[in-house]
Amino acid sequence: MRYFTAGESHGPRLTAIIEGVPAGLSLSAEDINIELKRRQGGYGRGGRMKIESDQVEITSGVRHGKTIGSPITLNVTNRDFKNWEQIMAAQDVEDKIKKQRRLTKPRPGHADLVGGMKYEFEDLRNVLERSSARETTMRVAVGAVAKKLLHELEIEVANHVVNFGGREISSPEHLSVQEIRETAGRSDLSIFDESQAEDLRTYIDQIKKAGDTIGGIIETRVEGVPAGLGSYVQYDRKLDAKIAGAVVSINAFKGVEFGLGFEAGKRPGSQVMDEIIWSENKGYTRSSNQLGGFEGGMTNGEQLIVRGVMKPIPTLYKPLMSIDTESHEPYKASVERSDPTALPAAGVVMENVVATVVAQEICDKFNSDTINELKKALVDYKKRLSEY
């Protein structure tokens, strides 16, 4: 299973093509729209979310509500395109139009300057349009398909914010996907402890008033994953490495950890490793889950616990200093639409990205043409594991 995305932030539409989804999976546009709506929610979101109300159009790979094994094409129209039609036109236009919304003042922390240098662009909008977080719309759309597939296999995924701009959010160590959905899933801040919500909203409002932004840490948990996904035999087959790469590929994500994560480096081994236990009913399990469900790059049958750190949004309403690429004179950086934080939305993106990697691994391992064949292969595999 693989996918590609295409489209610019202010272009006519965003597109994703997914290949390798087994035939027979029930799938509707509404399944995807639910996830797209989640991405556009959350406290602290602003202008673009009021303009866009994303709706997907499925144009291939699904017939009469079922996948048919061929590539699935997903399209999301940019409703704001009518205001950008000439500026973002594919055909050549007059110079006076080209100069409209031209960007020569790169924003610190964005791809603007380095992208312009790399591709020899005079107008840095060519970089901004693709490097924008708007691209994550299609990462979520793809993830919605992956989550539907995982649900059929009794694998579930959820996320919550565990740190908001340096403020820790309290949550229990043992936390099920269902508990996350019933708490953080109903919070506009995506937090487990709603008693902290009002203070956080005040904090976000203060950050917005100051023209600044905040980041934080998001935790995604996955349940129902069997042991043995991924492999230790080559570096690029380790599933935790694949997940880490996928998470840091999300706009503004700068780090990943599993289980104890970086805390493990501060403790002796006896306080880090998860002891192995066995019972006739459950087979091999662990006494704890401090390694976040991974050993040797492989799932060990425990809940997957993945955290990603998101830097503050780099577009500031009180912009930092930059250099104009035409004059080389110092200027305050350009200001596009921005929010004080996008953590709740970023959590939805991370959740769907992690789900996609897990679904890809399952499809690659069991290589089934139909969803029924995939289900049977997974049942047989779990039976083999239970007999070890």
UniProtKB/Swiss-Prot annotation:
Entry superkingdom: Bacteria
Which EC main class describes this enzyme? lyase
Name a biological process GO annotation. Answer: aromatic amino acid family biosynthetic process
The record's annotation in SUPFAM superfamilies points to: Chorismate synthase, AroC (SSF103263)
Annotated residues that bind NADP(+) are located at 39, 45
UniProt-annotated binding residues for FMN: 130-132, 251-252, 296, 311-315, 337
The catalytic activity of this protein is classed by the Enzyme Commission as 4.2.3.5
Q: Which cofactor does it need?
A: FMNH2
Q: Which InterPro entries match?
A: Chorismate_synth, Chorismate_synth_AroC_sf, Chorismate_synthase_CS
Catalytically driven reaction(s) = 5-O-(1-carboxyvinyl)-3-phosphoshikimate = chorismate + phosphate
Please name the pathway.
Metabolic intermediate biosynthesis; chorismate biosynthesis; chorismate from D-erythrose 4-phosphate and phosphoenolpyruvate: step 7/7
Q: How is the cofactor bound?
A: Reduced FMN (FMNH(2)).
Cysteines paired by S-S bonds: none
Gene3D superfamilies listed in its UniProt record:
Chorismate synthase AroC
Identify the keywords attached in UniProt to this record, alphabetized. Amino-acid biosynthesis, Aromatic amino acid biosynthesis, FAD, Flavoprotein, FMN, Lyase, NADP
Describe its function.
This reaction introduces a second double bond into the aromatic ring system.
**Subunit:** Homotetramer.
- Report the family membership: Belongs to the chorismate synthase family.
Q: What is this protein called?
A: Chorismate synthase
**Native organism:** Lactococcus lactis subsp. cremoris (strain MG1363)
